[in-house]
Amino acid sequence: MKIKVGILGASGYAGNELVRILLNHPKVEISYLGSSSSVGQNYQDLYPNTLLNLCFENKNLDELELDLLFLATPHEFSAKLLNENLLKKMKIIDLSADFRLKNPKDYELWYKFTHPNQELLQNAVYGLCELYKEEIKKASLVANPGCYTTCSILSLYPLFKEKIIDFSSVIIDAKSGVSGAGRSAKVENLFCEVNENIKAYNLALHRHTPEIEEHLSYAAKKKITLQFTPHLVSMQRGILISAYANLKEDLQEQDIRDIYTKYYQNNKFIRLLPPQSLPQTRWVKSSNFADINFSVDQRTKRVIVLGAIDNLIKGAAGQAVQNMNLMFDFDEDEGLKFFANL
């Protein structure tokens, strides 16, 4: 028997990837597409590549008969929309940032709004499947992690958990394709602005910073602060992070490989690459995999960690489906058994 799901925000890039994946999921039926601006429009007219013969509607969510609702909506939307009564009727996976951070003050600092639903904020489960699998299985509301966040945390988590690095030395240099900026028209994202170009943005201000710090702090069991700098790269999709940290001990690469293997050997979507094989965005394109590798610089006593994901799949829609699979006791990789399209 298939579960019935609905999607708010299916017109965006992440929403479209969600539709594409769910159409190929054997245990899901998409029965509702919500929109306030595209009511009556058939989804196939908006995205001819996606054969979903379903029109957008604008119904009261309390009227819907759904098992699960995905929210791929702008920040601050779901914080105002969701309530306990709705969560008694259906499960929710929120792809926005509205329930990712536990401290309400972080929303005032980083997102410039006062969170109106602090009780739900505390009850939401952070949907990084490789770290919080058991909590996700029991959750009614899952906060799907950010794209930079997913790549950064997964790449560094074992080092923080084992406390083998100087936490204050961590620097993350991240690069993302243009789809990470969303589908809305912006001058800075026009073809002539981004083609044959790479640029940094939001220095010391990127909103994924507190998210990364929060969950690496949980791993380290102490509050940490790190440096995160994102860049926009002239490609459609993909994230590559390069992270640097000072080692506290004289460790060899095999020592660190043993640590990563300890944490990730049983995870279906994390690929610890062989020595000397460095992650590339094309190897994870359109897939739910996170590729990770590292090198130890014996001269500087630093570990250099590389991670790559597809920002729209493992960084958004694919991870949301992975969360859904856990919440409904499906195989974790159901509907996600595809490799990179080189």
Swiss-Prot record:
Gene3D superfamilies: Dihydrodipicolinate Reductase, domain 2 (3.30.360.10), NAD(P)-binding Rossmann-like Domain (3.40.50.720). It catalyses: N-acetyl-L-glutamate 5-semialdehyde + phosphate + NADP(+) = N-acetyl-L-glutamyl 5-phosphate + NADPH + H(+). The active site is at 147. It is found in: Cytoplasm. Keywords: Amino-acid biosynthesis, Arginine biosynthesis, Cytoplasm, NADP, Oxidoreductase. It is an enzyme of class 1 (oxidoreductase). Pathway: Amino-acid biosynthesis; L-arginine biosynthesis; N(2)-acetyl-L-ornithine from L-glutamate: step 3/4. It comes from the Bacteria. GO terms for biological process: L-arginine biosynthetic process. Its EC number is 1.2.1.38. The keyword Cytoplasm applies. PROSITE patterns: ARGC. SUPFAM superfamilies: Glyceraldehyde-3-phosphate dehydrogenase-like, C-terminal domain, NAD(P)-binding Rossmann-fold domains. Pfam families: Semialdhyde_dh, Semialdhyde_dhC_1. Signal peptide: none annotated. One of its GO terms (molecular function) is NAD binding. GO terms for cellular component: cytoplasm. Catalyzes the NADPH-dependent reduction of N-acetyl-5-glutamyl phosphate to yield N-acetyl-L-glutamate 5-semialdehyde. PANTHER family: N-ACETYL-GAMMA-GLUTAMYL-PHOSPHATE REDUCTASE, CHLOROPLASTIC-RELATED (PTHR32338:SF10), N-ACETYL-GAMMA-GLUTAMYL-PHOSPHATE REDUCTASE, CHLOROPLASTIC-RELATED-RELATED (PTHR32338). Belongs to the NAGSA dehydrogenase family. Type 1 subfamily. This is N-acetyl-gamma-glutamyl-phosphate reductase.
